[in-house]
Amino acid sequence: MNSHFVSAHTPFYINTKEGRYLVLKAVKVCDVRTVECEGSKASCVLKVDKPSSPTCERRPSSPSRCERMNNPGKQVPFMRTDMLQNMFAANRDNVTSRLLN
């Protein structure tokens, strides 16, 4: 089986039951077979335990999107670092080279 790995467009958010996650780097995997499995019929089921970190459990929930939009004066500052700046520059260069080719 031949697999192809392609860099996905980043950054982006993923909304889950546990909260909202910012994805800074992602890899898109192509031509990989998906196996359907039902837990009740499977002979082996992967169990994932949630971390028991007290800082995660005590963290206050973030305000809803409506609350954020009602307070336009309170914008969250963007932390500028060389790592993020280089990542965005590389992404911009990749998009530019794709458009020109």
UniProtKB/Swiss-Prot annotation:
Cited function: Plays an essential role in virion assembly and morphogenesis. Also plays a role in the inhibition of host immune response by dysregulating mTOR. Sequesters host RICTOR and RPTOR, thereby disrupting mTORC1 and mTORC2 crosstalk. In turn, blocks the host antiviral response in part through mTOR-dependent degradation of cGAS, the primary poxvirus sensor.
Subcellular location: Virion
Source species of the chain: Monkeypox virus
InterPro entries from the UniProt entry: Phosphoprotein_F17
Family: Belongs to the orthopoxvirus OPG062 family.
GO biological process: symbiont-mediated suppression of host innate immune response; viral protein processing
Any one annotated GO CC term: virion component
Name under which the protein is recorded: Phosphoprotein OPG062
Subunit record text: Self-associates to form high molecular-weight forms. Interacts with protein OPG157. Interacts with host RICTOR and RPTOR; these interactions disrupt the mTORC1 and mTORC2 crosstalk.
Gene that encodes the chain: OPG062
Main location: virion
A Gene Ontology molecular function term of the record: DNA binding
Record keywords, A-Z: DNA-binding, Host-virus interaction, Inhibition of host innate immune response by virus, Late protein, Phosphoprotein, Viral immunoevasion, Virion
Biased composition (Basic and acidic residues): 56-68
Region described as Disordered: spans on this chain: 50-73
